[in-house]
Structure formats: structure tokens, C-alpha cells
């Protein structure tokens, strides 16, 4: 039962983290729809083709899995990276990077 609650809380937090950037993307697109690339650069304070440094959340814990065989069944840390890439008139291609350390 406790495992189910942990999984449910993790899924709810993922939905919460995903909702913020999506709202910002819609606001950005409506604000910049008729702008030139130079106007977008002035609006953003940086070049619109520059990528934004991703935000990073780290889950530290351990769990086991027998899928990978002996010696690879325990994981201690998972990094979840939510990065945003931009082009001339877009904000927010969501990028999910999972790395097991």
C-alpha cells in the first residue's frame, strides 16, 4: 500500500511540474506571434535560438530490479532534467533526461 502511495505522489508531482512550462509557452507564443526575430530577442533579453539551461531535480533513494541481472539491481540516484529548447517563435520543447548513477 505504501508503495502505491509513493508512486501516486510521484506521478502527481510530475503533472504539477509539467503544467508550469506549458502555461508559459502559451503566453510566450501569444505575446510574440507577430514579432520579428530581433523583437523576440529584445523581448526575451537573449537570442531566441539560445537554449535554456535545464532545471534539475534529483531523487535519492534505492530500489531493486532483477531485470538487469546480477550486479545491476540496485540504483541509488535518479536525475530528472526538464530542459527547454527554443527557436525563433517558440518556447518550450520539453526534454526529459533520466540518468541512473
Protein language model regions, located:
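N-terminal hydrophobic targeting signals that begin at the initiator methionine
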Residues: 1-2
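Residues within mature, well-folded domains
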Residues: 19-101
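C-terminal segment of classical bacterial N-terminal signal peptides
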Residues: 14-18
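Sec-dependent N-terminal signal peptides
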Residues: 5-13
